[in-house]
Amino acid sequence: MGSTRRAGRTGRTGRTGRGTIAVTACAAALAALTAGPAGAHEPEHRAPHWELKDTGTPDVRYRGLAAVGRNTAWAAGTAGTVLRTTDGGATWRNVSPPGAGELQFRDVEAFDARRAVVLAIGEGEASRVYRTDDGGATWTESFRNTEPKAFYDCLAFFDHRHGLALSDPVDGKFRILSTGDGGRTWRVLPDRGMPPAQDGEAGFAASGQCLVTSGPKDVWLATGGAADARVLHSADRGHTWKATTMPLPAGDPARGVFALAFRDRAHGLAVGGDFRPEQPSPRAAARTSDGGRTWRPATAPPTAYRSGVAWLPHSRTAALAVGPTGTDLTTDAGRTWRTVDTGSYDTVDCAPDHGCWAAGEQGRVARLEH
């Protein structure tokens, strides 16, 4: 669903690493954001912070983001724009698909500096998928939607070959697109194992994170716009699904779960709320430790709507959530959140080498420095 329906729906690849320690160096550094000033005899260190990178695209809003590493990232946004950096954001190359200027890219999944898949959203033929194998020098359109009722929101990959894309309901059920060759070809999965959608229920294409994976087969999708906000889970790559009602705001087209992040197949985070600037968003975050069967609301949630969320690499406890009014940090696996930055971002993504990136309106792309 865009607007943050037609302009704001949400997917992500299961790129977060598993760690054996509670908080790694990156996460520990982030925890410093919640600490007091250094002692009189301690050297002063600047706390971890977002450092904006000049993309040269002030008119573009980036809701699609793929962090390959600290040096390499892809961003996808309005006006058919796709950017890529391989030098930590010092320079950006415009690698937009030719003839895509009227499209809105809302998700990008990148396997490395050369291979990436981007999703354009919209009704009917506006929903498309493109793939590149040469860093964006050339693109192949691998899918163009022909179902007038479909509206694709986000995509996610299990590995370099297997992936899914999510559409709003068609004939009463969410539609799932599947690829087994890295996004070169796609097919619609049968909907026999998909529970019926609620009236008005849809995904939010707000950050590329309404569809996320962990491991070889587990995938979750997030919904809103209906009486209940829900998360649906599949353990067989999208063939069968089970739905769980969420403790996040619902009951309005502007409310629901906007983004998910799983650090493994059991532990996940959900963020969302009401995307309208004038509306409060209580209960804007929740967490699960059983793969999404049950969810508990955060005891101290973000103070406003959040559209993106990402675990810190190799951490069991630290994660970031972003939205138009700022960035929040949790260091206790989603129980409590604290605002640590007030800049506007729509999406956030982290790579295993501790490279974390955020992107949003007015061409804003930033890397976490620490």
Indicate residue ranges for each PLM-predicted region:
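Secretory targeting and sorting signals
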Residues: 2-6, 12-41
